[in-house]
Amino acid sequence: MAIMEKEFHCKRDELTIRGMQYFPCPFEEKEKYPVAILCHGFTGNYRSMENYGRKFAELGYIAVGFDFCGGGALVQEDPVRSDGETTDMRISTEVEDLSAVIDQVKGFPYADLQRILLAGVSQGGFVAGLAAARRREEISGLIMVYPALCIPDHARRGCLGGACYDPKKVPDRIDCGRSVLGKGFHDEVAGMDPFLELSAYGGRVLLIQGLEDGIVDYSYAVKARASYEKGQCRLQLVRNMGHSPDEGQFESIFASIRQFLAGREEILSIRIIITHSEKLCDNGAEQCNLYFTGYCESPYFQGTVLPGGCDVRREDPGKGKAVRAEYTLEGLDCEGQRCRLHIVNQWGQEDWEPVIRTDSRALAWLNEADLTAVLENGAGGPTVRIFAGRAGE
C-alpha cells in the first residue's frame, strides 16, 4: 500500500522537535484518522521507528515519529534533528517532548481525537507508558515494545546506558559510549517506581517483550502487566528475541499489534515443535510436509498436540503456493474437563484463518467463532497465537 510522508515539527519550551508524519494513501484532509505517536529508544531517532510508521499508515493511521530533544547517539550517520543536548535529556523531558507532540497532533483537523495511540520501544516505551498515565483521558491505547522499565534499577546499580559508575558518587557526566548523560538523569530516576506510575493509565495496553533480552529482563514486563487491572494489559513474550527484533520477528510483532488494534483477544498460544519433514514431487508440483508436536497453555485450554500434526506447503506451477496446517490437541478446558481441539489453519486474504472444532461444552463457542492467527517464528518451530473478537461471543 502506498503511503505519503510529510515533515513534522513542534515546540517544547524554546526547543524545536522534528520528525516525520506518515499518511495512508489516498488521504483526505476532511476525513478523520486515528493517530499513532511513535517513541524511539535510547540513542535512537525517529528513523528507527520508520518501519512502525509505515505499517501504521498502511492500516489507515496517521503515524507521527519524532526525535526526542537531546536523544540519539553522539556520532551517527543520520543524526537527531531535534534541538537539545544529551546531558540535558531526562525521562521527564522526554515525557514533556511527547506531551508537546500530543498537543500538536490534537490540533490537526484530520486527527480523530478519540483514537490517539502511543507506541514506543525501549526507553521510548517507558516514556510512552508514563505519558499515557499522565494524559490518560486523551490516550485510547498504549503499545510498549521491550520497554526499558529497568532504567531506575540501572541507576541504582550505577550502570545507566551501559556505563559503569559509583551510584553513591555520581559523576556530572555519565559516559555511555554512544551517548553522554547528565547527573540529573540519574538523580531523577534513581528514586522512581515505574510500575506505580504506569498503573494510573486505565486504557488497553499491549506489552511485547523478548525472552532473550540482555538489557531488559522479561521479569520487568511481567511485573508491569501485574501493575495494571486484570485483563487490561496483554503481555506477549517472544521466544528467541533480544533487545530488538529481526525482520521476521518484527513482522509477527506487528501482526499481533494489528490484532490488538482490531480489539481481538488472544485465546490460545500453541508452541509448535517440529519433529521431522519430507519433500515430495508430483507432476511438477513440489510439496514439503512438516510434522510436529507441541503444547498449549492458556486460560481457556491446556494440553498437547497429538501425533500426526502436519503442515503442508505445496507449490503448483500456475497455481502458486498453498500452506495448510492440521492438528489435534488433547487436554483440559477452562472448566477442567478433558476435551479435544481439532485445528485447521490456512492463509486467507489478509490473515491466517484457523477453524476449530471441539467437543468441549465450555468451549463450544469456538466452533462458530471468527478466528485469526499470527505465526511467530522461533527456534525449533513457531508459536501460533489464535485470536477471537471476544472470547465466548
Regions found by a protein language model. Name each.
Residues 55-81:
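Conserved alpha/beta-hydrolase
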Residues 42-54:
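The serine-hydrolase catalytic nucleophile loop
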Residues 201, 207-209, 213:
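Short beta-strand/loop motif that positions the catalytic acidic residue
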Residues 241-254:
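Catalytic histidine-centered segment of alpha/beta-hydrolase-like enzymes
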Residues 266-393:
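Beta-strand-enriched cores of mature, soluble protein domains
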Residues 134-181:
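Hydrolase active-site cap/lid region
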Residues 85-108:
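Alpha/beta-hydrolase active-site loop
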Residues 1-30:
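N-terminal cap/lid segment of alpha/beta-hydrolase-fold proteins
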